[in-house]
Amino acid sequence: IIGVSSIYEGVLYGIDLGLISEIKDEIILNVYKSSSDSETISISTSTIMFTSVDRSENTVWVLELAKINNDSNITYKPDPEKPMSILRFGLPENFVDLLIDSDLIGVEFVTIDKGFGILGNIYPGEHQLLFTYGINYFETALNFTRKTQFELNNLRIISENSIDLYLNDFDYSSEVT
């Protein structure tokens, strides 16, 4: 397998060319200017799915899919001098067993006290982030509260049949995680 990569403004760009015996076509590798300004980052869709309840362990299991948008021609590059500039996703208190997957290239994930952060660059376009976790609960009901770092355009909440879901006074507010 052959690939082409380049580093521009401290950001790695690359393209896989596959198995090639002869190259006759022009190869184009798109690179972008970079910025630590997160104004162009948004969450186009967030789907929160309550998948099951383990009543013996008092744990609710959740699967989430977030579509991250970078609506610019500039790669978002967190400022290394400002740790809070990384993309952060808040999770409910008492979360356990966090697993994360994404189509973001060359990133790592770090668990923080209130959720997790993405260590890496966000290239222009839409990217998917899938994560699952459990929430330990101590009462007969669980109060599920989330905060977002970025504008959220569309929210879907899905519940498995055995879970009673109430959205009393549902209100969305964008807050820093």
Regions found by a protein language model. Give the residues of each.
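Lumenal/extracellular ectodomains and adaptor appendage modules
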Residues: 1-177
